[in-house]
From Swiss-Prot:
Protein name: Thymidylate kinase
UniProt entry tagged with the keyword Acetylation: no
EC assignment: 2.7.4.9
SUPFAM superfamilies linked: P-loop containing nucleoside triphosphate hydrolases
Known catalytic reactions: dTMP + ATP = dTDP + ADP
Keyword Amino-acid biosynthesis listed: no
Length: 217
């Protein structure tokens, strides 16, 4: 089982992942929790390059670095874990590439699809939970109750977060378009709902879609 979480930073992905891991643990299901970029020695080094605010990276260079990190994670961790029957919860996967590099950076979609196919080895999530939040609200939530968009009481932003509001508006539009194209796999949730409400919806959907997963015979 591969469960992925998507959304712009500040939408609450990490919180919902922790809630889900705890809930699964109570049912005796031990989940492997991973993140993108990262998850292997090489992928973590790539993550540092991608997020370091002093590094200037071209859009195509950014795409290839994210994809290289993903390829390492898929080959070294995800494929073996899925083959052994483990449950994986992944903070970001290829939908982030479509939204961020496709819609955000404007990279050709055909090129994106080709590179995604290579980096994922054709692996697709069983279900994706997308926490939808407007960029302005996400930045407020993450850094300050009042400041938008790029100066938050002295807290330094990483390179991706410095891309600006228009970039994140395009990213959100990308996610919403993915929802239209893949309505069943890609589940949209309102990130402004209380944590417990979102968590309850996630558990309900997992139980509905995969009854033998949460309620094994």
């Amino acid at each position: 089982m591969l469960i992925t979480f998507e959304g712009i930073d500040g939408a609450g992905k990490s919180t919902q992942i922790k809630e889900l891991v705890h809930a699964l643990g109570l049912q005796g299901i031990e989940a492997v929790v991973l993140r993108e970029p990262g998850g292997t020695t090489v992928a973590e080094k790539i993550r540092q390059i991608l997020l370091e605010s002093s590094h200037g990276i071209t859009p195509v260079g950014e795409l290839l670095l994210f994809s290289a990190s993903r390829a390492e994670l898929v080959q070294e961790v995800i494929r073996p874990a899925l083959a052994s029957g483990k449950t994986i919860i992944l903070d970001r996967f290829f939908d982030s590439t479509t939204a961020y590099q496709g819609y955000g950076r404007g990279i050709d979609m055909e090129l994106l699809r080709s590179i995604i196919a290579i980096s994922t080895c054709g692996i697709t999530p069983d279900i994706t939970f997308y926490l939808d939040l407007e960029p302005e609200e996400a930045l407020k939530r993450k850094y300050s109750k009042t400041s938008i968009p790029l100066a938050f009481e002295g807290e330094e932003l990483d390179r991706m977060e410095r891309s600006g509001l228009e970039f994140y508006r395009n990213v959100r539009r990308g996610y919403l378009d993915i929802k239209q194209l893949e309505n069943r796999r890609f589940v949209q949730l309102n990130a402004l709902d209380p944590v417990a409400v979102i968590h309850g919806k996630i558990l309900a959907l997992l139980g509905e879609r995969f009854p033998s997963f949460l309620n094994p015979v």
